[in-house]
A protein has these predicted regions:
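Active-site bordering "gate/hinge" segments
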Residues: 1-238, 242, 250, 270, ...
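Dual-mode signal for accessory low-complexity, basic/Gly-rich regions
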Residues: 220-223, 240, 256-316, 364-379
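Structured core elements
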Residues: 230, 246-248, 304-306
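Conserved active-site beta-strand-loop modules that form the wall/rim of enzyme catalytic pockets
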Residues: 243-247, 253-256
Length: 382
């Protein structure tokens, strides 16, 4: 006897074409290349060449010129001198390189108006066929703006907790908050169409609940950050671990890693002395929640703590020799955090047990209704 209580899945031939063009519309609008522009692709040997060809195709259709510069891997930690003249002459940059967001030269180019698309999550053209690839980019932007509204326009504290006992906080001044939210990503601008923009494709990896843009990219600025996070997982580990492993911070630096298992010992060797450089959140409801490779889950409410390590790590070099990030970095993951913004007079919950509360913001629900059923769009992965 068999039971059929749910609708069978749609045959691919019924949905494939419409899904493809839906994703292509996102793709062509995010890559907002203009006639006559100079486009530079910062590539690596493991990038699907069809991705490069897709960008070239858009550029050719719009009368733009493309150059491709390749390094031996994505694990470029500083902009190579040989690439700088090409970068200086470009209007639009597509990059797989790790240094894209933090390198001072790259930051300076964006300050001059250069537009960037980072493709950490678009290394294979077949990703256009995923639910994440066709999810409306404007709706991702609405979710991000709703999250930004939960950050008070005042001095406040972001407080973390979870069932494992995490107790971690970051103190924000109004100036820090305004610095962080000023970028195109926190304004929900998902298209690479405004001067100085930096967008992720597939959308979206981040924006971050904290990074050094809150301090105007001053790496020496003190950070009011303290407490312990008990991550549930990390990139480079097959599955979430069962042990309660704690990472205690003083400022942005990890000063203690607790736990007795082999995993805890690996993390202790790896993480002690490491500095938090970004605390990212996912915002695309169709991103797979339990896919944390290569840099953390992009599902709403999934968090990744990006740690720059004190030294290259042997474990990373052994288990991920071709990782897109260098062995001086690690992304810790939580999938069930509660995060609240707290002022002297109020507190507001951004995440509730790993659920991004912005998904039920009235403005987000209204925006989702334009594209279909808000519950199906915002609270399912398929």
């Amino acid at each position: 006897m068999s039971y059929i209580g749910l609708a069978p899945g749609m045959r691919r031939e019924i949905t494939a074409t419409k899904h493809w063009f839906q994703a292509m519309d996102n793709f062509t609008r995010v890559f907002a290349i203009r006639p006559g522009e100079k486009v530079l692709i910062l590539a690596d040997p493991l990038l699907d060449t069809r991705v490069i060809d897709a960008v070239i195709g858009i550029a050719n259709a719009r009368g733009a010129q493309v150059r491709v510069y390749m390094e031996p891997s994505t694990r470029v930690t500083a902009m190579p001198e040989a690439a700088k003249p090409l970068l200086e002459s470009a209007d639009f940059v597509v990059s797989t390189w790790f240094c894209s967001i933090i390198d001072p030269f790259c930051i300076a180019m964006r300050q001059r108006g250069q537009r960037w698309v980072k493709i950490t999550y678009f290394r294979n053209l077949d990703l256009l066929e995923t639910p994440q690839g066709r999810f409306p980019v404007e709706l991702v932007g609405e979710i991000i703006r709703a999250t930004a509204r939960a950050m008070p326009d005042a001095d406040f504290t972001l407080q973390w907790s979870d069932v494992r006992g995490s107790d971690f906080c970051i103190g924000y001044t109004r100036e820090m908050r305004n610095n962080l939210l000023a970028g195109n990503r926190w304004r929900g601008r998902m298209l690479a169409d405004e001067p100085g923009c930096y967008v992720h494709y597939l959308p979206t990896h981040g924006p971050n609940l904290w990074d050094r843009t809150a301090h105007k990219n001053d790496n020496a600025a003190p950070v009011a950050m303290s407490g312990t996070i008990y991550p549930t997982w990390a990139v480079g580990f097959e599955k979430p671990w069962s042990e309660r492993i704690g990472c205690r911070f003083e400022g942005d630096t990890i000063v203690e890693v607790t736990g007795e298992s082999d995993i805890a010992k690996v993390l202790r060797t790896m993480l002690l002395g490491g500095r938090l450089i970004e605390l990212g959140c996912g915002f695309n409801p169709k991103a797979q929640r339990h896919t944390v490779y290569p840099a953390g889950s992009n599902n709403p409410g999934a968090l990744h703590f990006g740690i720059d390590l004190a030294r290259p790590d042997e474990y990373i070099r052994r288990v991920m020799p071709d990782w897109e990030e260098p062995p001086v970095h690690m992304d810790l993951v939580t999938l069930d955090s509660t995060v609240e913004s707290i002022t002297a007079n109020a507190r507001q919950r951004l995440l509730d047990g790993g659920f991004l509360t912005a998904l039920r913001d009235p403005a987000v629900v209204v925006a989702a209704a334009v594209y279909g059923d808000p519950i199906a769009l915002l609270e399912t992965e398929t």
